[in-house]
Amino acid sequence: MDGERMMLRVIDNLIVREKLTTIRCRGIDPASFRRGVTDIGRYMAYEFADTLKWREVEVETPLGTASGVEITDRDRIVLLSILRASLPFTEGVMKVFPEAEHGIIGARRSDEPPFRVSIDYIRVPELDDKILVIADPMLATGNTMIGILEALEAHGSPARTVVFNIISSRMGLDRVLQRGIDVYTCGVEEEVNDMGYIVPGLGDAGDLAFGRPSD
């Protein structure tokens, strides 16, 4: 059987909203930020699971036979982490889908317009007929995500591509959704400032999770 499909899903769960509130607080320490992002990734994976194919099964309990379900799409999922900001986000997703294959990509966006993107590392499994889940905490201008999608074209054609965000800008969503990509997010905000950051957003997710780099 198939779950319900959608293009954009805003997660409005009360627990997720509380987690989002916590990680947006100025002065949050890295450990607490990572923990909150991991939790959000896990809850988002639960929502996403409702769209996967499944079948009815029967299992033997100590006292008889019970009806249940089995997700048949589990072995088709490929998770993609974007260094370094998405690592705790992907960790949460992997708690729900531990058997998923895992790819890693290094992408860097310049700090000034036109916010060019460079891809300096990519290691991903074969993507043909897979369900590709790209976890990136922030979708601001959309340049990084578009650059990643273009870089992945050389690695196969997924049956479905899904983007997980914690916060998305309207601009970024418009660009990604035009490509037929499903997007899950916890919040949609209108403003992207001159530095390419979502406002009010939450700041630089990579720096918040791991500290500011020296370079």
UniProtKB/Swiss-Prot annotation:
Enzyme class, UniProt record, top EC level: transferase
Activity regulation details: Allosterically activated by GTP.
One Pfam family hit: UPRTase
Source organism superkingdom: Archaea
GO MF annotation: an example: uracil phosphoribosyltransferase activity
Known cofactor(s): Mg(2+)
Keyword GTP-binding (UniProt): yes
Pathways per UniProt: Pyrimidine metabolism; UMP biosynthesis via salvage pathway; UMP from uracil: step 1/1
GO BP field: UMP salvage; uracil salvage
Keywords assigned by UniProt, alphabetized: Allosteric enzyme, Glycosyltransferase, GTP-binding, Magnesium, Nucleotide-binding, Transferase
Catalytic activity: UMP + diphosphate = 5-phospho-alpha-D-ribose 1-diphosphate + uracil
EC number: 2.4.2.9
Cofactor detail note: Binds 1 Mg(2+) ion per subunit. The magnesium is bound as Mg-PRPP.
Binding of uracil, residues: I198, G203, D204, A205
Magnesium keyword on record: yes
Family: Belongs to the UPRTase family.
Protein task: Catalyzes the conversion of uracil and 5-phospho-alpha-D-ribose 1-diphosphate (PRPP) to UMP and diphosphate.
UniProt xrefs under NCBIfam families: PRK00129.1, upp
Record's protein name: Uracil phosphoribosyltransferase
Species of origin: Methanothermobacter thermautotrophicus (strain ATCC 29096 / DSM 1053 / JCM 10044 / NBRC 100330 / Delta H)
Gene: upp
